[in-house]
Curated annotation (Swiss-Prot):
Residues 142-146 are annotated as: Flexible linker. This is Holliday junction branch migration complex subunit RuvA. It comes from Leuconostoc citreum (strain KM20). InterPro entries: DNA_helicase_Holl-junc_RuvA_I, Hlx-hairpin-Hlx_DNA-bd_motif, NA-bd_OB-fold, RuvA, RuvA_2-like, RuvA_C, RuvA_C_sf. The gene is ruvA. Homotetramer. Forms an RuvA(8)-RuvB(12)-Holliday junction (HJ) complex. HJ DNA is sandwiched between 2 RuvA tetramers; dsDNA enters through RuvA and exits via RuvB. An RuvB hexamer assembles on each DNA strand where it exits the tetramer. Each RuvB hexamer is contacted by two RuvA subunits (via domain III) on 2 adjacent RuvB subunits; this complex drives branch migration. In the full resolvosome a probable DNA-RuvA(4)-RuvB(12)-RuvC(2) complex forms which resolves the HJ.
């Protein structure tokens, strides 16, 4: 129902802020990180209204991209508004988009309230749906590079399945690309490198 509210931010609390519009009505907006806003400053805050059986709640966002990401997260099974705000509070939208693009569920578990199953669900539900956000926000998404060396590709896939992040695997590929080895040999070399 609401797209945004222009007004004076009158109060800032740990979980929400109050913004008064020009007619004097104060709106309580739950936000990911209220301290990104300044008190007693006219602001343009994007808003999402969520209506539940026994409550109507307004959620505020610093920009359209944050609101877009919030709505995408709400489409993930097991993610509600509070969980979505907790994820957004980390202020790592680029990391989230990159993790989804690279199927890196282990990276997503660093967000509050996101366990292994929820992280896998986020990747499953949002894969390919955040590309337009990355483009509009000017984010660069680091994807795991591919290789023609099948043994190396198998080793890298095995390392990812063991829970190593896509970022670590990409670094390993550059280190191991100059070697000729078997899949097992690549895995041993990679593990030695990771333990250092």
């Amino acid at each position: 129902m609401y797209e945004y509210i222009n007004g004076l931010i009158t109060n800032i609390y740990p979980a929400y802020l109050v913004i008064a519009d020009r007619s004097g009505v104060g709106y309580k907006l739950f936000v990911a990180n209220p301290y990104r806003f300044e008190q007693n400053v006219e602001s343009h805050v994007y808003v999402e209204q969520i209506v539940r059986e026994n409550e109507m709640t307004l959620y505020g966002f610093i920009d359209e991209n944050e609101k877009y990401l919030f709505n995408k997260l709400l489409n993930v099974s097991g993610i509600g508004p509070k969980s979505a705000l907790a994820i957004l509070a980390s202020d790592d939208a680029a990391g989230l988009v990159t993790a989804v693009a690279n199927d890196d569920a282990s990276y997503l578990t660093q967000f509050p309230g996101v366990g292994k199953k929820t992280a896998q669900q986020i990747v499953l539900d949002l894969k390919g749906k955040l590309d337009d956000l990355a483009l509009s926000a000017g984010m660069t998404v680091e994807t795991v590079p591919t290789t023609d060396n099948q043994a190396l590709a198998d080793a890298l896939a095995a390392l990812e399945s063991l829970g190593y992040s896509a970022k670590d695997v990409a670094k390993l590929q550059t280190v191991l690309a100059n070697q000729k080895d078997t899949t097992d040999g690549y895995i041993r070399s990679a593990l030695k490198f990771l333990v250092k």
